[in-house]
Amino acid sequence: MKLPFSGGCSCGAIRYECSAKPLFSWNCHCRDCQRASGSTHCPVLYVPKSALKVTGPEAKHATVHAESGRPVSRGLCTNCGSNLFILADLVPTMQGLWAGSLDDPNIFKPQINVWTRSAPKWSLLDPSMENLDVAPNAEQFQALLDGAA
């Protein structure tokens, strides 16, 4: 992956640039991500917060409790409504980026599908990827981090 990579909202008001490779990436199929994305899942890559530079107005954050029961904060542009960021208390040193906000969405390489028990029957899950019923356990999460290196 060529660094840095960048992205932003639809109207261009908020831009970001990341100087580090993603730590891990996944497609989350929990009901909260379905509602937030208006689709079957939310494609997200997580990067070190320290490697992310954001310019423009501050994103509006709304905190909800995800299907896991844990709080998740989603950041969006107040001008155009584009979903950009995800902050999860489970990974406090990381910033989630919605793959659709990338300037080049083809750099998104999901490693795993999570919360597939909540995926609608009409959802197309990639059979070549690991599909977890819920979120990864500690061992599976460490494997994700090791696999992204």
Q: Predicted regions span which residues?
A:
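A short Gly-Trp-Pro
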Residues: 1-8, 13-149
